[in-house]
Structure formats: structure tokens, C-alpha cells
From Swiss-Prot:
Residues spanning the signal sequence: none
Subcellular localization: Mitochondrion
Family to which the UniProt record says this protein belongs: Belongs to the RRG9 family.
Transit peptide: 1-54
Primary role: Required for respiratory activity and maintenance and expression of the mitochondrial genome.
Residue numbers spanned by region Disordered: 58-168
Stored InterPro entries: NGRN/Rrg9
Name of the molecule in the record: Required for respiratory growth protein 9, mitochondrial
Species of provenance: Penicillium rubens (strain ATCC 28089 / DSM 1075 / NRRL 1951 / Wisconsin 54-1255)
CC terms in the record's Gene Ontology section: mitochondrion; nucleus
PANTHER family xref list: NEUGRIN
Gene name in the database record: rrg9
Keyword set includes Transit peptide: yes
Principal subcellular localisation of the protein: mitochondrion
Bias-annotated ranges (Basic and acidic residues): 112-168
Length: 288
């Protein structure tokens, strides 16, 4: 199939080529210093050999005449410079550290070895692993822990202790503690003469010397006065003498301590009971 020579001259590529040729001859002098300021060779030099042909529209060129036309170096140079930058960009390639193409895509991730987890070694799926973990947690919640056992035991013991009926002595002790703050065993000790005096006063005038009056007079609890009056025990002659001697020695010890503090005068009777006489003799020599 033959084509008309006139129609080939009117093709778009031929028209553009002629326009570029005419414009480049007029603007060549003004374009050269701005386009290529660092070039040592003139732009329209005949020595420049371009290695690629004008191909702004390859599809239109293929449809035209297959006979090659003489290429003008200046025209192609200007056309190459005026092309948009998007036609000059080349496809970037990914390189890995060894220089292979698409190096990042060729590496495959190796699955991590979960050696410490027994669930992964059995080849179970994610659903089976979740079910196994949930079942293990439910079983752990069912088993009571040690601190829970201790708490339950203490709770049961306290409940049993509260329900247990108190003994007779516990009832009496609670009643005495509620009635008398000092209790039935007062810290203050009464001498044998004081005990005899309490009994004598209450026997002579019971209406005048009541329990409350005697408790206030001797500075003891009413329960102590009641027990003294209720008691029927009477010591023998020997027991009375022994109690009297012990009470006198107690009095002398207290007097000696007060004398050392300067609160009581020192006497010959109490001087032998002082701490100084225990550590040193009469000649102020230390005892061995």
C-alpha cells in the first residue's frame, strides 16, 4: 500500500519539525546563554552527535511514512530541551545491599520460633489456642488459693466462737468488769490493821459505815470492801505475827527508798535497807 507524498508532508510530526527548525534559528543566540550556561561547546555545533531520535509522539510517527528523513542537530537539541520532565523520568529500581533487583521483595519473613510456648509447638490454630487459654483460666479460678483458705477458716472460727456459749467464770468476769473498773483485785494493798479496822467499823455501825463509805475512806473499790466483809477466814496467832513482820519490813523498804530520794528522813532502822548499805559496808568499802 502506497502513501501520498503530499500527505506525509502535512503530518503532525513533520509540521512540528519545521516549526522547531524555524524558531530555533531565530532564538538560537538568545537561548544559548540561559539554557546551557556551563556548556563549553556551542549549542548548534555540527560536531554534536545525538544518540536518541525525536520521539515525542511515537504512535503518530509509526503511522507515517517509514522512510527516515535527515535529522537536524539543532532542531532535535531544542526539542529535547523543551520536552516536559515527565517524559524524561525513568523507572526506579529497588536494590538491596547485594545489588539485586527488588531486593526488599525477595526476602521472605521467617516465622519466629516460639520454643518456650508449648501451644505453638502443637500446631494449633489461633482459635484453639484462645479456647485452651480460656479453659485454663476457668480451671484456675475454680481452685481456691491458700490465702482464701485461711480467710475462710478464720471466718468460720469467729462465727463458731460467737455462737459458743460462754462459761460461768467468763460471765462473772464480764459482770465484774462492767460493774467495777478496778476489778476485785485492787492494786492497793491494805495492812492487817486496816483489814481488822474495816471489819470492826462495819460490825459496830453497819448503817453508818456502808460499803460505799468504807470504799471512799480507804480508797479501794466497793468490791474489795465487800469481799473483805464477806470473808470468814481468820488467821491464827502465828500467822498474825508473820503477817505483821512482813508488813513492817515492807514499810521499812518503802521508807528507805523515799529517804534516798530525799523525801523522808533517814533513820537507823531504815538505813540498813538502803541500796548504799547493800553495795558498801559501814567503812564505805565496796562489798565483795
Amino acid at each position: 500500500m502506497t502513501k501520498c507524498a503530499a500527505s506525509s508532508r502535512l503530518a503532525l510530526s513533520a509540521v512540528l519539525r519545521n516549526v522547531f527548525h524555524s524558531q530555533s534559528s531565530k532564538l538560537g543566540a538568545s537561548i544559548t546563554p540561559y539554557r546551557r550556561p556551563f556548556a563549553s561547546v556551542p549549542l548548534f555545533s555540527s560536531d554534536i552527535q545525538l544518540q536518541r531520535s525525536f520521539g515525542s509522539m511515537p504512535r503518530l510517527c509509526d503511522s507515517q511514512n517509514e522512510q527516515p528523513e535527515p535529522a537536524v542537530p539543532g532542531t532535535l537539541t531544542v526539542a529535547d530541551d523543551t520536552l516536559p520532565s515527565q517524559h524524561k523520568t525513568t523507572k526506579r529500581k529497588d536494590y538491596d545491599s547485594s545489588g539485586k533487583t527488588d531486593g526488599w521483595n525477595t526476602h521472605k519473613r521467617q516465622p519466629k520460633d516460639h520454643g518456650g510456648n508449648p501451644e505453638n509447638r502443637t500446631g494449633r490454630t489461633d482459635r484453639e489456642r484462645r479456647a485452651f487459654r480460656n479453659e485454663t483460666r476457668r480451671e484456675a479460678k475454680k481452685e481456691p488459693r491458700k490465702w482464701q483458705d485461711r480467710t475462710e477458716k478464720v471466718k468460720l472460727f469467729s462465727e463458731n466462737k460467737g455462737n459458743k456459749k460462754p462459761e460461768h467464770w467468763q460471765v462473772q468476769k464480764a459482770a465484774l468488769k462492767e460493774k467495777f473498773a478496778g476489778g476485785w483485785n485492787p492494786p492497793k494493798k491494805l495492812s492487817p490493821d486496816a483489814l481488822d479496822g474495816i471489819r470492826h467499823l462495819h460490825a459496830k455501825a453497819p448503817e453508818q459505815f456502808t460499803t460505799a463509805v468504807l470504799a471512799q475512806e480507804f480508797e479501794v473499790s466497793p468490791e474489795a470492801i465487800r469481799r473483805i466483809l464477806k470473808s470468814k477466814w481468820r488467821p491464827s496467832e502465828d500467822e498474825m505475827e508473820s503477817r505483821r513482820k512482813r508488813w513492817e519490813n515492807r514499810h521499812d523498804r518503802i521508807w528507805s527508798r523515799m529517804a534516798e530520794l530525799g523525801l523522808r528522813p533517814s533513820t537507823n532502822r531504815t538505813r540498813t535497807l538502803s541500796d548504799f548499805h547493800v553495795l558498801y559496808d559501814d567503812n564505805n568499802r565496796k562489798r565483795r
